[in-house]
Amino acid sequence: MVRPLRNVILWSFCIVGGLSAQDPRTIIEKTVNHDRRNYRDLQSWTYKVSDRIEKSDSSGRTKAIETTLDEVLYLGGKPYIHPLRKNGKPLPAKDTAKEQAKLDKATAEASRLSEDERRKREQQTEKQREKDREMLQYLPDAYNFTLLGEEIINSRAAWRIGVEPAPHYNGKYGFLLKNLEGTLWIDKDENQFVKGDIHAIKGFSIGLFLASIAEGSRLYFENVRLSDGLWVSHRAGFEGSARVLIRHIRQNEELQFSEFRKFQTDSRIVPAEP
């Protein structure tokens, strides 16, 4: 019995030693940089986004469920979004034809762009993309990180990292980041965000105080790796309460991303199967 017990103890020390040798802040810094490259590379792909919103009353009972299905394309370096379904049903034939005409027009306009015009649009898209992801670059300074262990997710090893606000952080987005904590999972081999589960530890306001998020609200996301190595969103959501102006909203919303493929200039809207 002594040798097996000793082996277990030695194995435990090896695991702890392996974890302590990893700096979670460094892991996060690398992951943020990789995420920026992923987001940039996504512009050569088209994919579908389903949006499900479940609205509840003050007692938590469901009042209404709304769903949409859209396709996202990049035309001439600029994102283009058009609808496919609403509330589980294909668009009426008239609306489908209208959306196809709009897509054909946008595709034709993109094909006539000069190199300078295309480059300018790409630069504008890149500027907006950097703005959308800007907050991520402040994560290493805004939080204290704890390496909690490893997990296997989708047959790949991932670090599990606890995230807590750094008490003395007063930098950009501090008004938001100081009110969120949770757990991040990072792919070990490629330093990519695999998933996140974040909670509001305090209520906070956003958008010049025009909107606020209630304490206890939850934000989550999951990413997946495509066969060519690109990491993309799989699903993301919000659960909780918010206030917009004087209106209180209680809802769960989830976005699901699917059917990633290289964009073809002859893309046409194909009615989704009922």
Model-derived features with residue positions:
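Bacterial N-terminal signal peptides that target proteins for export
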Residues: M1-W11
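Hydrophobic h-region of N-terminal signal peptides that target proteins for export
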Residues: S12-A21
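Structured extracytoplasmic
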Residues: A21-E181, K188-K195, H199-S217, N223-S233, ...
